[in-house]
């Protein structure tokens, strides 16, 4: 059985990985009304004059073979000194549990510090979600400065995607993606899994932050032969290009240049109705 979102974040935070986990506390949702004063006091002491996120961590939210991601509510940008606002946000999350079924003892609430100066955020799948192809698929927003645009799908900047073959991370030139995927690879080793769904953010100093991690639940639908087919195709492409770049006897020049229609058809240049320039 996979651990809850809250328990996983606590465990990863304790590992002191490249991925930073924003400061958090968690508590059971089922007895909040009985101990609300104690919890509010703890939140106020832990997060003084800061913006916090009140996040769901339901018992059935992140399973190994089934996910209820997005079915429960989280409330962002709650001011930690505002008792009424905190209570209202917690009750909103608990209500989202009750709308689906009765609250369970395993249901938790996460209270977590909001990140500041975010320059990029998004979701990484460590294999293609639909096919299992061996690529890191990074859906990201590097424009808005928010942390939830990709997961909510509500931003015009939420559709940027980068594919990086799992064996080609060392070929990257972008410092931010190098740092991000280095952190992802360490997390894979720590969790002993190459099939992860990761929510992340980067700050202005390119420090990677882990907001959530769960198992990819679409694995049973994958064709296990896809990895071999892709690798064979890539090898074929590499061989084809290598052959084309060989120096040709009797042809001037040392380098080959591949182009699309480098010699234009004059008819296409002047168009169907040519006229004097």
What does each model-found stretch correspond to?
Residues 1-110, 117-119, 196:
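N-terminal beta-alpha lobe that positions the nucleotide/phosphoryl donor
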Residues 1-18, 84-90, 105, 122-277:
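Conserved divalent-metal-coordinating catalytic cores
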């Amino acid at each position: 059985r996979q651990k809850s979102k809250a328990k996983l974040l606590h465990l990863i935070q304790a590992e002191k990985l490249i991925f930073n986990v924003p400061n958090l506390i968690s508590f059971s949702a089922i007895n909040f009304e009985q101990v609300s004063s104690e919890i509010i006091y703890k939140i106020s002491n832990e997060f003084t004059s800061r913006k916090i996120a009140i996040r769901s961590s339901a018992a059935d939210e992140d399973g190994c073979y089934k996910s209820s991601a997005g079915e429960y509510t989280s409330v962002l940008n709650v001011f930690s000194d505002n008792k009424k606002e905190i209570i209202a946000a917690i009750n909103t999350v608990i209500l989202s549990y009750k709308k689906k079924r009765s609250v369970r003892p395993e249901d938790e609430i996460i209270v977590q510090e909001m990140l500041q100066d975010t320059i990029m955020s998004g979701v990484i799948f460590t294999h293609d979600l639909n096919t299992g192809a061996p690529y890191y698929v990074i859906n990201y927003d590097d424009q808005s400065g928010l942390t939830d645009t990709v997961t909510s799908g509500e931003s015009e900047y939420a559709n940027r995607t980068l594919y990086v073959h799992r064996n080609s991370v060392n070929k990257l030139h972008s410092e931010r993606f190098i740092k991000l995927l280095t952190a992802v690879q360490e997390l894979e080793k720590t969790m002993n899994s190459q099939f992860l769904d990761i929510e992340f953010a980067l700050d202005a100093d390119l420090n990677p932050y882990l907001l959530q991690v769960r198992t990819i639940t679409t694995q049973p639908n994958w064709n296990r032969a896809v990895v071999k087919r892709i690798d064979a195709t890539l090898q074929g492409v590499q061989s084809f290009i290598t052959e084309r770049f060989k120096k040709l006897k009797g042809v001037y020049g040392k380098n080959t240049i591949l182009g699309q229609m480098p010699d234009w058809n004059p008819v296409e240049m002047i168009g169907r109705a040519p006229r004097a320039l």
